[in-house]
């Protein structure tokens, strides 16, 4: 079996490398600006101590909070069919309500609005 897999995978790798080398010159970018790195809207060659807007910081913190909460919910929600205790179900509902209230609070005070009206 390995005698068939090894030559097949090597020939596939070689074929893909040849295709890449033949087509790499077809997609050259004319603009120098397209080749420069783009990182959070800042010029990488500018002063690194320039102040960052608080909107980036708030958005990052909110993303981390909701990301951690979603990661915590995945194992719990996968076990819902095995749970029969009302205490566990009520704790899940309470956790979801806290998430929903936090999201509504942020929407009400305009934290999630990127462009101010």
Swiss-Prot record:
Write the Enzyme Commission number(s) for this entry: 7.1.1.2
Subcellular location field: Mitochondrion membrane
Q: How does it sit in the membrane?
A: Multi-pass membrane protein
A single Gene Ontology MF term assigned here is:
NADH dehydrogenase (ubiquinone) activity
The superkingdom of the source organism is Eukaryota
Report the enzyme's class at the first EC level: translocase
Record's catalysed reaction(s): a ubiquinone + NADH + 5 H(+)(in) = a ubiquinol + NAD(+) + 4 H(+)(out)
Q: Please provide the record's keywords in A-Z order.
A: Electron transport, Membrane, Mitochondrion, NAD, Respiratory chain, Translocase, Transmembrane, Transmembrane helix, Transport, Ubiquinone
* InterPro entries per record: NADH_UbQ/plastoQ_OxRdtase_su3, NDAH_ubi_oxred_su3_sf
What GO CC terms are in its UniProt record? mitochondrial membrane; NADH dehydrogenase complex
Any stretches that span the bilayer, and where are they?
Answer: 2-22, 56-76, 85-105
- Physiological role: Core subunit of the mitochondrial membrane respiratory chain NADH dehydrogenase (Complex I) that is believed to belong to the minimal assembly required for catalysis. Complex I functions in the transfer of electrons from NADH to the respiratory chain. The immediate electron acceptor for the enzyme is believed to be ubiquinone.
Q: Give the family from UniProt.
A: Belongs to the complex I subunit 3 family.
Would you tell me the protein name for this molecule?
NADH-ubiquinone oxidoreductase chain 3
Source organism per entry reads Albinaria caerulea (Land snail)
């Amino acid at each position: 079996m390995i005698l068939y897999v090894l030559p097949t995978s090597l020939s596939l790798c070689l074929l893909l490398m040849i295709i890449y080398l033949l087509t790499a010159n077809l997609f050259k970018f004319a603009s120098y600006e397209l080749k420069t790195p783009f990182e959070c809207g800042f010029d990488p060659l500018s002063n690194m101590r320039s102040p960052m807007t608080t909107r980036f910081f708030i958005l990052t913190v909110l993303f981390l909070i909701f990301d951690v909460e979603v990661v915590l919910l995945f194992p719990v929600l996968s076990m819902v069919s095995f749970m029969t205790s009302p205490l566990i179900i009520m704790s899940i509902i309470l956790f979801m309500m806290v998430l929903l209230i936090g999201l509504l609070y942020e929407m009400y005070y305009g934290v999630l609005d990127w462009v101010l009206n």
